[in-house]
UniProtKB/Swiss-Prot annotation:
Entry's Gene Ontology BP terms: translation
CDD domains, A to Z: Ribosomal_L29_HIP
Originating organism: Mycobacterium leprae (strain TN)
InterPro entries recorded: Ribosomal_protein_uL29, Ribosomal_uL29, Ribosomal_uL29_CS, Ribosomal_uL29_sf
GO cellular component: cytosolic large ribosomal subunit
Record-level Gene Ontology MF annotations: structural constituent of ribosome
Family the entry assigns: Belongs to the universal ribosomal protein uL29 family.
Record keyword Ribonucleoprotein present: yes
Protein name: Large ribosomal subunit protein uL29
Highest rank taxon of the organism: Bacteria
Amino acid sequence: MAVGISPGELRELTDEELIERLRESKEELFNLRFQMATGQLNNNRRLRTVRHEIARVYTVLRERELGLASGPGGANGEES
């Protein structure tokens, strides 16, 4: 998984790809938390990065749900 993926890059993905990325990030977060609990985690910063990635994916999905942004290849927002 890419470290620090930008919201612009996420907006280029389809809904299915976003959901898959969300699943992967949640799985990685679970594994990182498990490593932290057992004292095996070397990079504490990665926890924060993964949580932010999850939030970014949720944000892009919510924007599409509300019609604030369209999927890849579509126009963003509405014209007035």
